[in-house]
Amino acid sequence: LAVLLAVVFPGSPLHVDASPWLPLHLALGIASYGLFAAAVVHAALMSHAERQMRQGADHDGGLPLLTLERLTFRFVGAGFVLLTATLAAGWFFGEQLYGKSWVWNHKSVFSLHSWIAFAVLLFGRNRFGWRGQSAVRVLYIGAIFLLLAYVGSRFVAEVLLERIA
């Protein structure tokens, strides 16, 4: 999806030499996106397995529900650590590139919202034992915010704001 949108809405290239933090920031961001994407896929499989279990359907040979849940939260936990590191690297990178550490733009706001959603999810899981569809909904909300942080911010900046201007 990201590649397709990059082809349809090409942007300006980033200058990697602008900051030594940029390659680290990009690598951490890509890794965190990958982990959260894996978490979303596992959450969808978990929802399917839970739905089959509630309907009394035969087991389709997939992973057991508890295994899917455990894997989903491992992906979320690892993704959260990398997203936190991504935001920290971006904070340092922003200081060097923009002259201030935090720029209030679409990318920053959506990234912060996704971080908060994942923090709430992990806190709720550890403190209150959130499981099943409640946890999956919060995961999906965080993933949507994360998707909007990159793809959405480019779409807003390059398509919507360009049409208004």
Residue ranges of predicted features:
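Membrane-interface interhelical connector segments
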Residues: 49-68
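Gly/Ser-rich phosphate-binding catalytic loop and adjacent alpha/beta segment
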Residues: 13
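Hydrophobic cores of alpha-helical transmembrane segments in multi-pass integral membrane proteins
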Residues: 1-10, 29-48, 69-93, 106-160
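Short acidic alpha-helical/loop segments enriched in Asp/Glu that coordinate divalent cations
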Residues: 53-58, 90-101
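Non-cytosolic membrane-interface motifs at loop->transmembrane helix junctions
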Residues: 16-27, 98-109, 135, 165
